[in-house]
Amino acid sequence: MVLERGPGFDAYGTELPPIEGARVRAVTADARLVRQIQACLEGAPDYFARTEGGPPGTDAAARLLADAEGDDLRRVYALVPLAGGPAVGVLDVYLHHPEPGVAHVALLLFREACQGLGYGKETTAALEDALVRCGFRTLRLSVGVENPEARAFWERIGFAEVGRLDRGVAVFEKKLA
């Protein structure tokens, strides 16, 4: 079966509905949001020190968007407060990865000043809701051994380790309703 494709649709004909919680919404990232996304990346120096060994490059946001641009199964979002103001975080998710019906969170990151405020739990719940409405069955992600805080976060909101990759990377999964 060949599915019609248009703007916002992927190779499977999937267009995600809005991802919006009580306080924050996901806005599809484009060139207009590069500065805000870069500020979010730079606003999480501890994450980059642990995972990359240093701060993000000055063009990290532009590279993130360029990498995602050619992949119709990938979505990058700026996480923006409903009350207004600059982005507080970034969401990078692959649809139908590694197989149909599975989505993979490549990055959920918030400025350090915005961590611990419940935005991560709220954003994940909104993402799960959008995915379920599109027929996804599973949400998956990977966490490196150098990031125990992220591991604890994902476990707190119902994700379970289902496997290991090279270099101590744990794969987590949550079955969606």
PLM feature segments, named:
Residues 2-115, 124-126, 130, 134, ...:
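Acetyl-CoA-dependent GNAT
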Residues 118:
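Glycine-rich phosphate-binding loop
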Residues 35, 151-152:
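Alpha-helical elements of the RecA-like P-loop NTPase motor core of helicases
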